[in-house]
Swiss-Prot record:
Claim: Membrane is one of the keywords in the record: yes
Residues the record lists as binding a 1,2-diacyl-sn-glycero-3-phospho-(1'-sn-glycerol): 156
One cellular-component annotation, GO: plasma membrane
Alphabetized InterPro entries for the sequence: Lgt (IPR001640)
Source organism (scientific name): Borreliella afzelii (strain PKo)
Function description: Catalyzes the transfer of the diacylglyceryl group from phosphatidylglycerol to the sulfhydryl group of the N-terminal cysteine of a prolipoprotein, the first step in the formation of mature lipoproteins.
Entry protein name: Phosphatidylglycerol--prolipoprotein diacylglyceryl transferase
Superkingdom as given in the UniProt entry: Bacteria
Protein family according to the UniProt entry: Belongs to the Lgt family.
Record's subcellular location: Cell inner membrane
Alphabetical list of Pfam families matching this protein: LGT (PF01790)
Length: 323
C-alpha cells in the first residue's frame, strides 16, 4: 500500500485556469482586508480616539511598506539569478523580462516586517505628525500583530496551492508536482522509494519523492497558534504598549526557526551554514542553517530589543506623569 499522498490534481495556482487571478494574490487581498477590519475593531473596542481618515492613511503606509519590504527581500536576498539587479523594474511589476504577466510570485516576510515598521514610522512623523495615530503608534503595532496573525494562514494555503515552499522528504508526505526530483543514484533514494511504495523502473534517472507539507505546518503555528497566544494570553498580561508586537515578532521567529528544519532549503541558496554536507537522503544536521533561520534569529533578537526599548519608553512616560 502506498505510504504517500498525491498532490491534488484539481488544485492550481489560478483560481480559474486561464484567468490570471491567483490564490496567492487573493490571499494578500483577504489578509489586508482582515487586518484593516480587525485593527479598526480593536481601536473602537478600546475607545481610542483616532480619525478614520488618519487610520486609513496609516494603513496605506503599512500595507505599502510591507509589500515593498517583502518584495525587496525576496528578489534581492533570496533570488540569486541576478535578473532583478539587471532588470530592477521587475521587482515592482507583475511581469517577467519578456513582459508576460506572472503576478507577484515572491514575498519574504522578514522584509515585510521591516517595511511594515519603517513606512508607518515615516508617515506618522510627516503626514500624520501631531495626530492621535502618532500618539498611539505603539498601541497600533500591537493591534496589527494580532490582526495579521489572524489571517496569516491564508498566505501559506496559497503557497500550498502554488505547490511551493514544500518540505523535506518524509514517509506519508505529499508528492508535490513542482518538487525537485532526486537522482536515483543518490544513496538511499531507491530504498526510500521502495519503502513508500514507489516503483523505480530501470530507465528512471530521476524520481519525485513525498515531502513534508511544511507550508501548512508553518501556517498553522505562525497563524492560528500565534494568534491564540496573542489574543487569549499576552493581550491579558500586557503591561505597556508595544509589548505584543515584540512578542509577536519573537513568536513568529521561534516557530519559523524550528519548522525551517522540516522545509527544503531554497535551491539557489542551500544551507548558509553547511556544517554537514548532504550526501545521502538520510543525512541531517541541526547545525545546517538556512537563510530563513538566520533571518529568524535576527528577527527574534529584534523582537527582544523592541520589547526592551518600548518598556523603557513606557517607564519614562509613567515617570513623567508621576512627576
Amino acid at each position: 500500500m502506498p505510504n504517500y499522498i498525491n498532490y491534488p490534481s484539481w488544485l492550481h495556482p489560478e483560481v480559474i485556469q486561464g484567468i490570471p487571478i491567483t490564490w496567492y494574490s487573493l490571499s494578500y487581498i483577504f489578509i489586508i482586508l482582515i487586518s484593516y477590519k480587525f485593527i479598526w475593531y480593536q481601536i473602537q473596542s478600546d475607545r481610542i480616539d483616532i480619525k478614520k481618515e488618519d487610520y486609513e492613511t496609516f494603513m496605506f503606509s503599512l500595507v505599502l511598506g510591507a509589500i515593498l519590504g517583502g518584495r525587496l527581500a525576496s528578489t534581492l536576498v533570496y533570488d540569486k539569478s541576478g535578473i532583478y539587479y539587471s532588470h530592477p523594474w521587475l521587482i515592482l511589476l507583475p511581469f517577467d523580462q519578456d513582459w508576460n504577466f506572472t503576478g507577484f510570485r515572491g514575498m519574504a516576510i522578514h522584509g515585510g516586517f521591516l517595511g511594515a515598521i519603517i513606512a508607518p514610522l515615516i508617515t506618522i512623523n510627516t503626514k500624520l505628525k501631531n495626530t492621535n495615530v502618532q500618539k498611539y503608534f505603539l498601541k497600533l503595532t500591537d493591534y496589527g500583530s494580532i490582526a495579521f496573525s489572524s489571517g496569516y494562514m491564508l498566505g501559506r494555503l496559497a503557497n500550498f496551492a502554488n505547490a511551493e515552499l514544500y518540505g523535506r522528504v518524509m514517509k506519508g508526505g505529499i508528492i508535490f508536482p513542482n518538487a525537485e526530483p532526486f537522482d536515483t543514484n543518490i544513496p538511499g533514494v531507491k530504498e526510500f522509494a521502495s519503502s513508500v511504495g514507489i516503483e523505480i523502473l530501470p530507465h528512471d534517472l530521476l524520481i519525485n519523492l513525498p515531502r513534508v507539507p511544511s507550508q501548512l505546518i508553518e501556517g498553522f503555528f505562525e497563524g492560528p497558534v500565534t494568534f491564540m497566544l496573542l489574543w487569549f494570553l499576552f493581550r491579558k498580561i500586557k503591561k505597556y504598549d508595544g509589548f505584543i508586537f515584540g512578542v509577536y515578532i519573537m513568536l513568529y521567529a521561534f516557530f519559523r526557526f524550528f519548522i525551517e528544519y522540516l522545509r527544503e532549503p531554497d535551491k539557489e541558496l542551500g544551507f548558509i551554514i553547511n556544517y554537514k554536507p548532504i550526501k545521502s537522503l538520510s543525512d541531517f544536521s541541526f547545525l545546517n542553517i538556512s537563510m530563513g533561520q538566520i533571518l529568524s534569529l535576527a528577527l527574534m533578537l529584534s523582537g527582544l530589543i523592541w520589547i526592551i526599548v518600548t518598556k523603557k519608553i513606557s517607564d519614562k512616560k509613567t515617570k513623567s506623569i508621576l512627576t
